[in-house]
């Protein structure tokens, strides 16, 4: 049976790990065992971070909407309830963006929600 030398494949695998560990400090960037562990952990953090990002942005949008509806005498929850009753279907991301960049349009939406709550 022929002898299999794995130097080429091992080098390619290591090169891939070192590329991913670029920018790491200390042994984590140039020792394969430490680099592999560091890259694995970095990928775990990245995975969790992608999930947290969605929660954080939704929370930010809600805070912005809440701050924007307070001058109209509403709270966030009453505002959302008013939107549902009036049949307005706009997501929180767009509402937040409107509150910042188009205050007049947001005010019209807030007044519509307030009217739906009163009725």
From Swiss-Prot:
PROSITE patterns hit by this protein: RIBOSOMAL_L20
Signal peptide (UniProt feature, chain positions): none
Alphabetically ordered keywords of this record: Ribonucleoprotein, Ribosomal protein, RNA-binding, rRNA-binding
InterPro entries for this protein: Ribosomal_bL20, RIBOSOMAL_L20_CS, Ribosomal_protein_bL20_C
GO-annotated cellular components: ribonucleoprotein complex; ribosome
MF term (GO), any: structural constituent of ribosome
Gene Ontology BP term (one): translation
Source superkingdom: Bacteria
Record-linked SUPFAM superfamilies: Ribosomal protein L20
Similarity-based family: Belongs to the bacterial ribosomal protein bL20 family.
NCBIfam families: rplT_bact
Its biological purpose: Binds directly to 23S ribosomal RNA and is necessary for the in vitro assembly process of the 50S ribosomal subunit. It is not involved in the protein synthesizing functions of that subunit.
Protein name: Large ribosomal subunit protein bL20
Organism name: Afipia carboxidovorans (strain ATCC 49405 / DSM 1227 / KCTC 32145 / OM5) (Oligotropha carboxidovorans)
């Amino acid at each position: 049976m022929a002898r299999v030398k794995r130097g080429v494949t091992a080098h390619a695998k290591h090169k891939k790990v070192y590329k991913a560990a670029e920018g790491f400090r200390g042994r984590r960037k140039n020792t394969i065992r430490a680099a592999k562990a560091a890259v694995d952990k970095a990928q775990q953090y990245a995975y969790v971070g992608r999930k947290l990002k969605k929660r954080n942005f939704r929370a930010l949008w809600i805070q912005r909407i809440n701050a924007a509806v307070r001058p109209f005498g509403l709270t966030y929850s009453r505002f959302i309830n008013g939107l549902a009753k009036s049949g307005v279907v706009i997501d929180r991301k767009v509402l937040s963006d409107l509150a910042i960049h188009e205050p007049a349009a947001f005010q019209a939406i807030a007044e519509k929600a307030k009217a739906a709550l009163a009725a």
